Amino acid sequence: MKIRSTALVKGFRQSTPYVNAHRGKTMVIMLGGEAVAHNNFGNIINDIALMHSLGIKVVVVYGARPQINQLLEKQDLTTPYHKNIRITDEAALSVVMQAAGQLQLAITARLSMSLNNTPMAGTQLNVVSGNFVIAQPLGVDDGVDYCHSGRIRRIDTDAINRTLDQGSIVLLGPIASSVTGECFNLLSEEVATQLAIKLGADKLIGFCSEQGVIDDNGNAVAELLPIEAEHVIKTLSENHASDSDYNTGTLRFLKGSIAACRAGVPRSHLISYKVDGALIQELFSFDGIGTQVVMASAEQVRQAGIDDIGGILELIHPLEEQGILVRRSREQLEQEIGKFTIIEKDGLIIGCAALYPYSEERKAEMACVAIHPDYRDGNRGLLLLNYMKHRSKSENINQIFVLTTHSLHWFREQGFYEVGVDYLPGAKQGLYNFQRKSKILALDL
């Protein structure tokens, strides 16, 4: 008898909303030269092919920084930098073109592989590269001639979209030609950023040395707003002044993410090229694995509606089974849905609370407080409480009270104090369950 993995089945089911959400969307992937050189490169290519097979339109932009440096060293050449940009003279341009050409062939070859007994078995991918990007020289800055280092002049988005619509993967590198027929060395992060903006991509994804932005505890920061990302850039620039990776790929991509976000790209993702499956975990799981730069938070606090009843019931059922919450039927929830506030993330209800006002006493009960077990390490309970406080004040309520059997200390930390049964509004006193012996706590607004 074959052993069937329930984890595999569960993973497929949980990823279904994301498969449906991402189908037909355009995503730009930044693949630095460090990622190509890493031993996880083959797995990254397999994951990109999987994305394509799920109906995602994929544009891959590759960098070649370490490969260029290796070739320069072999030829005993050095290239100066000005404002963290390589000055590309004639000799350096030849090396850059050689490195970029080799990487283009290597990536194309891996995407073309379809051997049996491999994740690419049966895959028939068309990889298209071309003069989609037109460059122009950076020129002279502070008396320094950048030579063949350039910037983007324009992008042929119509041609790229036609190629994507035909089912091909678009592959672009750091070399682009100009209207005069010259070649220029571009920053691959800038190429990826501008492609995402001009194509109206749904996502910009960058493979970095770390699993996104790392906090003081060594954990990836799940989400950053642009202004927060700017603060991170300032801190990283100061703390990693001698770290070449942070001063090139990671910081440049983070800067590009901010620009893309402010230009209308909904989300930019920073993930590690060292972690097997990071791309799939980031795109097809509830929590992701790296850092997102977003214009607005993926989590929303809002008033519940009739369509949220199923999600609320699913959230509170385990707590009802444990006796932490009083049971509520679907019918009761339908009648009281207007009193509920929820926290929603990517279509999943991860938190809820209800507010029952007693207008004559100018008091309100905060009840049915629940947070999804995977999200209890944040401040979402406090988020719901603050929302309830704001809502209570708007309804001319002076005090909020709760009945709890398990969360006494948390509520006391938020300023609640213990009161007796006689504190409760008359209508609530008659419903108090003396066998349950819930603690009653109040908060002055």
From Swiss-Prot:
The keyword Transferase applies. Residues 299-438 form the N-acetyltransferase domain. Belongs to the acetyltransferase family. ArgA subfamily. Pathway: Amino-acid biosynthesis; L-arginine biosynthesis; N(2)-acetyl-L-ornithine from L-glutamate: step 1/4. GO terms for molecular function: L-glutamate N-acetyltransferase activity. Its main location: cytoplasm. PANTHER family: AMINO-ACID ACETYLTRANSFERASE, AMINO-ACID ACETYLTRANSFERASE NAGS1, CHLOROPLASTIC-RELATED. InterPro entries: AceGlu_kinase-like_sf, Acyl_CoA_acyltransferase, Asp/Glu/Uridylate_kinase, GNAT_dom, NAGS_kin, NH2A_AcTrfase. Keywords: Acyltransferase, Amino-acid biosynthesis, Arginine biosynthesis, Cytoplasm, Transferase. It comes from the Bacteria. It is found in: Cytoplasm. It catalyses: L-glutamate + acetyl-CoA = N-acetyl-L-glutamate + CoA + H(+). GO terms for biological process: L-arginine biosynthetic process. One of its GO terms (cellular component) is cytoplasm. This is Amino-acid acetyltransferase.
